Amino acid sequence: MRLVIATDEKKFFRQFLEILRSIPPLTKLRNRELDILAAMMYYNYLYKDLDDDIRGRVLNSKATKKDVREMLGMSQDVYNNNMSIIRRTGLIEKSGRLADALQVFPGTSYKMEFHFNIEKDVLR
C-alpha cells in the first residue's frame, strides 16, 4: 500500500506521531502530550544543523519552551506536567534530547516503511 500525504513542516510531525500512535510508548500519550512532542520534534528539525548536544540544550532552553507553550496555547504548569509524562516514556531525555526514533529530518518529502513480522496463531 502506498499513501501520499500533503502536509507542511509544522503539521508533518504531528501526523508522523499519529501514524505511530498505536506503537508503544506512544500509546501511553494523550493528545496534548503528542502535541508537545510534535512541537519539540519540529524545533529539533529547525535546529538540525547544530551539534546533537547543543541542539538538546536549545530544545531545553526557556526560550524554546516558551515558544512551544505559546504555539500550543498552554500555561507553564500544564506544559511542565505534560513534559514530565513524556520524559517518563523515555522519548525526551532530561537534557532535552529527543529519542533516536524521533530524530526525524524531512526534506521536501519523507518516506516511512513498515515491516510486520507476523507469527502464526497456534490453535490449541
Residue ranges and their predicted role:
Residues 1-28:
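Positively charged, structured surface patches that bind polyanionic biopolymers
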Residues 5-12, 32, 60, 78:
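Non-membrane alpha-helical secondary structure
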Residues 10, 16-19, 34, 66, ...:
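Intrinsic disorder/low-complexity segments enriched in polar/small residues
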Residues 22-23, 43, 71:
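Alpha-helix C-capping/helix-to-loop hinge sites
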Residues 28-29, 74:
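Alpha-helical hairpin
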Residues 29-63:
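Short helix->loop/beta-hairpin flanking segments within DNA-binding domains
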Residues 50-101:
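Winged helix-turn-helix DNA-binding recognition segment
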Residues 97-124:
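Short, cationic-aromatic polyanion-contact patches
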